[in-house]
């Protein structure tokens, strides 16, 4: 076969294969840095262009519509082990029972298997509750649980055994999204801004997305031209590098950890506990001295930088330097809330256009924290701060939908990273596929 015919045949084959992954059902799964549980969604994508409107109804003229959702708390032992693995030497805090591992490496293997078994149960429950046949689902996008994110060392580790999920659900699984970006010099994070651009960017204005998960990150989405607004088109030929996105600092990670330490709750619902306290300004200023806040973007962070041990160390230093200042645990929660609001709003204000109407759309679990939303609005007086619900997608499901979209990008052979966001040298197809 000559080169021309071979190339033509290959192109035709690829087009046929990738088109089969276009208008179909996908499952997205996400468990964030705060380790509060696993979210799973079932959605359908299409190639129709209208990214400013998203449907939760049966409307195939929309780029995406959400068909079903399900969320499940982690089993207590799995959560305990994952939290331990997130910290250097954290397994020393674990007391193994009969048959459990006795070394860190074995705990990694145990957690990867247990996480996948739990994820499989979550998927099967989602399918059962939505009365969905597995044959209609093209793939699962499963992020896994980040236990180490070391971009300065060139690696990021997400625990999940995709083989188990594929076997137990009968659906192909795309996972390990971050390391391909890191292989071309990127931070491996944040990845969600690429999805934000695909779904939320509009031709006539700039939009800013703020994701408040365990870590906060922003995506600044410039107006897109009509000829480039197709939901399917996301490649090296698009001007996607004009998107800016990066982590801004801690969010729910510290808020939840401090709440769990001092109350009988896992999180500060609505921010009511924080609102009952007073911000300790000298402590806030000390926390803002963390070197991450002055780093230039692209940048990413995680539990390695911001964790309960770091906070307790900072409190100890503060107590030694300011012994005359008295504060309560609620005051610390108020201060941590202000830390998130200030660090995020400071970065958002860089991109605010004083002559235009500006809107910031918030997603992630932090969008449900009314007090945090109030503090963000206070620090962003030139913006209207609202959640992505006003764009048609509830804030708690955005990240799970994003990984369904990333799985689709992988199967279609399309890039999933934004080099200007992650610092990668080029756009690449992300993830590894485990076929059912």
Swiss-Prot record:
Name of protein: Anhydro-N-acetylmuramic acid kinase
Record function comment: Catalyzes the specific phosphorylation of 1,6-anhydro-N-acetylmuramic acid (anhMurNAc) with the simultaneous cleavage of the 1,6-anhydro ring, generating MurNAc-6-P. Is required for the utilization of anhMurNAc either imported from the medium or derived from its own cell wall murein, and thus plays a role in cell wall recycling.
UniProt cross-references to Gene3D superfamilies, sorted A to Z: 3.30.420.40
InterPro entries reported for this sequence: Anhydro_N_Ac-Mur_kinase (IPR005338), ATPase_NBD (IPR043129)
Pathway: Amino-sugar metabolism; 1,6-anhydro-N-acetylmuramate degradation; Cell wall biogenesis; peptidoglycan recycling
Species for this entry: Psychrobacter arcticus (strain DSM 17307 / VKM B-2377 / 273-4)
CDD domains associated with the record: ASKHA_NBD_ANMK
Record: residues binding ATP: 32-39
Entry EC number(s): 2.7.1.170
Pfam families: AnmK (PF03702)
GO biological process assignments: 1,6-anhydro-N-acetyl-beta-muramic acid catabolic process; amino sugar metabolic process; peptidoglycan turnover
PANTHER family xrefs: ANHYDRO-N-ACETYLMURAMIC ACID KINASE (PTHR30605:SF0)
Top-level taxon in the UniProt lineage: Bacteria
UniProt GO molecular function: ATP binding; kinase activity; phosphotransferase activity, alcohol group as acceptor
Similarity section: Belongs to the anhydro-N-acetylmuramic acid kinase family.
Catalytic activity, as annotated: 1,6-anhydro-N-acetyl-beta-muramate + ATP + H2O = N-acetyl-D-muramate 6-phosphate + ADP + H(+)
Keywords recorded for this protein, A-Z: ATP-binding, Carbohydrate metabolism, Kinase, Nucleotide-binding, Transferase
């Amino acid at each position: 076969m000559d080169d021309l015919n071979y190339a033509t045949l290959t192109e035709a084959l690829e087009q046929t294969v990738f088109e089969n992954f276009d208008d179909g059902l996908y499952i997205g799964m996400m468990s964030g840095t705060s380790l509060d549980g696993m979210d799973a969604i079932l959605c359908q994508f299409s190639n129709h262009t209208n990214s400013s409107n998203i449907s939760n109804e049966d409307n195939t003229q929309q780029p995406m519509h959400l068909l079903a959702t399900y969320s499940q708390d982690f089993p207590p032992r799995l959560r305990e082990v994952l939290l331990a693995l997130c910290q250097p030497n954290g397994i020393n805090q674990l007391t193994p029972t009969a048959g459990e591992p006795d070394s860190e490496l074995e705990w990694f293997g145990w957690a990867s298997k247990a996480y996948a078994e739990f994820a499989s149960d979550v998927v099967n429950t989602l399918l059962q509750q939505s009365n969905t046949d597995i044959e209609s689902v093209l793939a699962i996008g499963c992020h896994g649980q980040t236990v180490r994110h070391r971009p300065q060392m060139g690696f990021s580790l997400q625990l999940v055994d995709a083989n188990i999920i594929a076997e137990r659900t009968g659906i192909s699984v795309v996972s390990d999204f971050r390391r391909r970006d890191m292989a071309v010099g990127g931070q491996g994070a944040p990845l969600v801004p690429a999805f934000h651009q695909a779904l939320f960017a509009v031709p006539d204005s700039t939009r800013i997305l703020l994701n408040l998960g365990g870590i906060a990150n922003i995506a600044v989405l410039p107006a897109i031209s009509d000829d480039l607004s197709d939901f399917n088109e996301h490649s090296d030929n698009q001007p996607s590098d004009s998107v800016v996105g990066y982590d801004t600092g801690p969010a729910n990670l510290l808020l939840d950890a401090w709440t769990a330490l001092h109350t009988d709750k896992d999180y500060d619902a609505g921010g009511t506990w924080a609102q009952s306290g007073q911000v300790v300004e000298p402590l806030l200023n000390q926390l803002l001295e963390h070197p991450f806040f002055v780093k230039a973007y692209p940048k990413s962070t995680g539990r390695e930088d911001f964790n309960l041990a770091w906070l307790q160390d900072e409190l100890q230093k503060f107590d030694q330097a300011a012994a005359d200042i008295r504060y309560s645990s609620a005051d610390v929660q108020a201060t941590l809330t202000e830390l998130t609001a200030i660090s995020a709003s400071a970065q958002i204000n860089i991109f605010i256009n004083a002559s235009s109407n500006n809107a910031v759309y918030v997603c992630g679990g932090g969008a449900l924290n009314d007090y945090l939303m109030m503090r963000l609005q206070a620090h962003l007086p030139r913006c209207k701060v609202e959640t992505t619900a006003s764009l048609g997608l509830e804030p708690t499901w955005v990240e799970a939908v994003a990984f369904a979209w990333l799985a689709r990008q992988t199967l279609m052979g399309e890039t999933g990273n934004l080099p200007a966001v992650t610092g990668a040298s080029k756009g690449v197809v992300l993830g590894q596929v485990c076929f059912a």
